[in-house]
Amino acid sequence: MKKILAFVLIMAASLPQAISAKKNEVPSELKVMSYNIRLATGKDGTNSWEFRCPATIEMLKDQKPDVFGVQEALINQILFMKEYCEDYDNVGVGRDDGKKKGEFMSIFWNKKTVKMIKWGTFWLSETPEKPSMGWDAHCKRTATWALMKDKKTGKKFYFVNTHLDHRGKEARKNGLKLIVDRIESINPEGYPMVLTGDFNMKPDNPAFVGLDARMKSARKVAPKTDNHNTFNAWSVKPSDKVIDYIYFSGFSSCLEYQTVTKKYLDRPFVSDHYPIIARLIF
């Protein structure tokens, strides 16, 4: 009886200290980005990759995301960013063969602030474990996921990056559903989750219903946000083309959502999509 009483007294004495430590815990911020880089093609004239690649590096060094997902990147673009952004590493595969062929839905992270634990890629199709085209898609589409750890707090989180089909309506709907189902199955621990990507559909599309029920749109919930279009088509003219997104779950809040429209190295655009950023709090 005396031992039990002593244990209770010790626990009671330590409780205020635990509560005080929790109150004094400094919130940790995770800055994430989604960036459709526009694949390297000669069809873009003066907006081709060879002309805007230095501006991309300048943008990344200026914005300093902890983690970012790129869409449409070819292997030469991946290697260029790794060479000139020394603080970053990446994972991902080419969508055409699961190796280096085709566009990458790659995830980059700052090695100083984030640690990679494990990662994988699946295809948005009826056979997601192998390179394949799903439903009415025009191209092979993938999602890359990674389990990561914030070095400051030691907290783990998942980051998922994708690019839905630009033509197939069923492919977009079913692809997004597959992503939602998959990210739930790989995260039984319920770690915080980030989903980035070019979804090729506007916010009012019915295909968002399932995702909206499980995750929050940074654009919609951040107290500091904007209403800028994310697809620019190499034009500064405003439009309603909001097709790039950052969704999250498990974080305490989203401080800010931002569409990056700033010019770098006098280049009017770093892509035909504007990068988008969210500042999340654990």
Task: Describe the role of every protein-language-model region.
Residues K2, L15, I19-Y84, D97-G102, ...:
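N-terminal, active-site-proximal structural segment of metallo-dependent hydrolase catalytic domains
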Residues I4-A13:
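Sec-dependent N-terminal signal peptides
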Residues E29-T41, M105, I117-F122, K155-D165:
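Active-site-proximal beta-strand elements of phosphoester/diester hydrolases
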Residues L30-I37, T56-M81, F108, A146, ...:
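Active-site beta-strand/loop signature of hydrolases that rely on acidic residues for catalysis
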Residues S34-P54, K100, L124-H138, D165-G168, ...:
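Acidic/histidine-rich helix-loop elements
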Residues T46-F51, E72-I75, H166-N174, K202, ...:
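Soluble non-cytosolic domains of exported or imported proteins
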Residues V67-Y158, S253, Q258-V260:
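Structured beta-strand-rich core segments of catalytic domains in phosphoester-bond hydrolases
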Residues E170, N174, I183-M193, M201-F282:
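Metal-dependent phosphoester-hydrolase catalytic domains
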